Amino acid sequence: MRKTLVLTLGILLVLAAMPSLFAAEAPAVFKAKCAACHGADATGQTAVGKTMKIRNFHSAEVQKQSDAELTKIITDGKGKMPAFKGKLTNEEVTSVLKFIRSLK
């Protein structure tokens, strides 16, 4: 729990120091690493998404999760969602998180 909190705070500090990171990188990272399952529009309506019953990132169910919860899912995986620890940098995880938050 403490490790997740420290990781989340570190990610938020990096994001605060680099405001242009999200604008330039987030959609590209999402498209490259997430869209195959979650869809380019993040609704989960891909063939894989429908089969695995992937949640729509625009939904209140997803948006009510804390940044720490979403960061943990992205890095460690959950259920059928694979872990991206070691596959995404902390900055890329932050970009994906900010992209998800932009879908409100």
Model-derived segments and spans:
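Positively charged n-region of N-terminal signal peptides that target proteins for export
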Residues: M1-T4, L9
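Sec/Tat signal peptide C-region and signal peptidase I cleavage site
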Residues: L5, M18-A23
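Hydrophobic alpha-helical segments of integral membrane proteins
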Residues: L12-A16
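Soluble non-cytosolic domains of exported or imported proteins
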Residues: A24, K64, K87-E91
